[in-house]
Amino acid sequence: MAKKSKIAKEQKRQELVNKYYELRKELKAKGDYEALRKLPRDSSPTRLTRRCKVTGRPRGVLRKFEMSRIAFREHAHKGQIPGVKKSSW
């Protein structure tokens, strides 16, 4: 489980990205890079990290399920993810 402070920090970044999305889009279209530079750093979407919705783990996250590989494996074995089954050939 990730530290709660890290998860909270990531949520705060997501809120800032959502807040400044339209303004950032307009400034980019105008080419006003000076004004873009004055916006908060955390309002840039490139600073976001995908995190596991179950554990908060930042690495090894499967995009489709928004879960880390470890949590995905556990839930898949229990049959808690619809449409996922262990393959064999």
From Swiss-Prot:
PROSITE patterns assigned: RIBOSOMAL_S14
Keyword tRNA-binding: no
Keyword field: Ribonucleoprotein, Ribosomal protein, RNA-binding, rRNA-binding
Family annotation (Pfam families): Ribosomal_S14
Classification via InterPro entries: Ribosomal_uS14, Ribosomal_uS14_bac/plastid, Ribosomal_uS14_CS, Ribosomal_uS14_sf
Bilayer-spanning residue ranges: none
Cystine bridges: none
Single GO BP term: translation
Single GO cellular component term: cytoplasm
Keyword flag Ribonucleoprotein: yes
GO molecular function annotation: rRNA binding; structural constituent of ribosome
NCBIfam families: PRK08881.1
Self-association and partners: Part of the 30S ribosomal subunit. Contacts proteins S3 and S10.
UniProt function note: Binds 16S rRNA, required for the assembly of 30S particles and may also be responsible for determining the conformation of the 16S rRNA at the A site.
Family: Belongs to the universal ribosomal protein uS14 family.
This protein's name: Small ribosomal subunit protein uS14A
